[in-house]
Amino acid sequence: MSLDFYIYPGVHESGSESISFNITHNLVPMAKKAGLYEPLWRPEENYDEPVLASDVYPAIVAGFNNLVIDPENYKDLNPENGWGDYNSLVDFTADVLAALRQYPLAVVEACR
């Protein structure tokens, strides 16, 4: 099971197709601890729809900063089964943030 996080730049900005990112649900405990779960896994429950990149961006930046400031606080939550780890959540979040910065008016959606 995994999360698919979609960014639809073409809804409010022209010239682009959807961008998608995927990550395992095994990292939910780590994402919750960092403050990333609500904006990435459940944006539609926490923001007015349509949810825009600019809506979730501040919370994802804060969660990302939590991850990188204190890695040891999160590495203990690496899944025992080996599916996903701290580094994959950092990379996933960095990639999502780059796309959100590029398309601040894009609609975002999470499929769980």
Language model segments and positions:
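Acidic (Asp/Glu-rich) sequence patches and key acidic residues
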Residues: 1-112
